[in-house]
């Protein structure tokens, strides 16, 4: 045997000895295996998220994690968490626990995010580096501030002739309010998406306020209350103090229609929009008048009310939406700031319908030609809270 025949076996033995006889450990693939969705209650006060690696390892591997706000806020809706997830040899699954703050306050469904980062001994699986925790809300108590603008309960030379302070809990006072129900004709003429109900899920009096809730629970529902056939009036001052819902596709309104609508139709009866807001413009409200002999010749005249520097939106605190109405003139006011007037001179040659009796309507529409459809950013349930409505003459 010559020396050349020994060189390759010897080299193989040396290489095997240097590697310890084992294959190198493959990098671990870190990933989440679940999102988490649950109602906010004591039974679901902890959200657990599973983190997995593709296969057990012979040495320790780890990855960092941290929570981040979505629409849910750390310290208000959940407890912020961060740290390391360590996989001991042989382990393939670990759990991250995030504590949920349970309360009784009605609020929209909200979410937060848990993210993985800085893997040691492995890498992050594409598109599975984050998990979402969605906090569903089934509470009924409402938490809003009484902060904001207010108006007096009397004016010199005028008397309170009608109003509602919403002091009796439950359904709206049937001696003052009735309902429009259903989905109307062509979505109430605007391709709106909601079905109006008289359910306490959509309209209720609580803590001295009337609440109208816009919901999305297997279909859009809301409420539309009115005084038609119960109370109408001609001339005077109206004050309505309210907090408004906001969000894409949300459309709250405080408005009036001519009492002769059943005989002359719309828009010949006249329409006075004391306040309308389209939810994607949360710092702007509109005041508008509609008239004309028929739908083909309908006319309107409207303006945007002055935007306030504080609060940021009309959902943050109460504002008072008012009109001052006399023969041949109506003025619209926001927090006692006069911003628009209509007179017969604005009718474009058509009949002025605003010297006749009108009735009130208050509603929250969902979707429609003006605001557009809701999307994933729209907070549900949304609500309008009315503190009082008063008529002085």
What is each stretch, according to the model?
Residues 16-18:
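C-terminal motif of bacterial Sec signal peptides marking the signal peptidase cleavage site
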Residues 1-8:
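Bacterial N-terminal signal peptides that target proteins for export
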Residues 126, 137-393:
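GH16 jelly-roll
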